[in-house]
Amino acid sequence: MIPGEYQLKDGDIELCAGRERIQLDVGNTGDRPVQIGSHYHFAEANPALDFDRVKVRGYRLDVAAGTAIRFEPGQTRSVTLIPFAGTREIYGFRGEVMGSLDSTN
């Protein structure tokens, strides 16, 4: 292998294969663009974004790691979300969870 070389598998690679997916319409009611990154807890996204936050608790964007989706002012677009995996613990963001997504608290 040459340093920095990529050795890619032939064919398509499906991201998050077999994971549950939900579709959601999201509108930006603000006067500034809003960008949401791939692993941001979508329910805690900018309050200017209009969508059902209860429905998407524990979900993130179904996009490649390190990428994002931008919502321009007044724009409504459909996004696909997938649930967080692993320990399903959320810390930080806007501080609305700060622990297990699966707890009943």
Swiss-Prot record:
It catalyses: urea + 2 H2O + H(+) = hydrogencarbonate + 2 NH4(+). Keywords: Cytoplasm, Hydrolase. Belongs to the urease beta subunit family. GO terms for biological process: urea catabolic process. HAMAP family: Urease_beta. This is Urease subunit beta. It comes from Marinobacter nauticus (strain ATCC 700491 / DSM 11845 / VT8). It is found in: Cytoplasm. The lineage of its organism: Bacteria, Pseudomonadati, Pseudomonadota, Gammaproteobacteria, Pseudomonadales. Pathway: Nitrogen metabolism; urea degradation; CO(2) and NH(3) from urea (urease route): step 1/1. It is an enzyme of class 3 (hydrolase). It comes from the Bacteria. NCBIfam families: PRK13203.1, urease_beta.
